[in-house]
Amino acid sequence: MAEAYIIDACRTPRGVGKVGKGALAHLHPQHLGATVLAALRDRNDLNTADVDDIIWGTSTQKDKQGGDLGRMAALDAGYDTKASGVTLDRFCGSGITTVSLAAAQIMSGMEDVVIAGGTEMMSYTAQIADPKKPFMMDAGNLSLRAKHPQTQQGCSADAIATIEGIDRAAADQLYLRSTPYSISSWSSRLTIRGQPMAT
């Protein structure tokens, strides 16, 4: 089985996800993705015709953040038209899913060069874009809701911790154990390099 390697990683700056308030909120989501894809191409002297696929993730795949965001961002970045793209929506797990799928494609031998990433502009999420319409993972499907009631991540995390017997002290201990790793990562520059945005 082939090995899969992460060669580089890049991200845009974070900002407030409110139009009129956030520094990046007025930008098109495809432009955010294109900025990252262009940086990866330039930093690695990448011939984009060699890219087999671009697997992109998003949450709330609608409006300007809808469609095949990965493919459109690649075209906006000037990638060769041979570089295909696919976009998936697995809510907050979209980014890690794209990396897993990219590795699987490479390890299976189906593809050689895959770029994985994602874009989420909070100004497009239902709760922020239209506060009168609360976000529902079941999209208003009452039959599904009756069979499988769903809740948000914070409530789910609290319920799981309660069921598994993880109390606040244990959560705090995990935080204290993981913080030195985070500090070490920052100081040794193992963190993802950010890409400035032209606003």
Regions found by a protein language model. Give the residues of each.
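Active-site-proximal alpha-helical scaffold in enzymes
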Residues: L88-E120, A161-S182
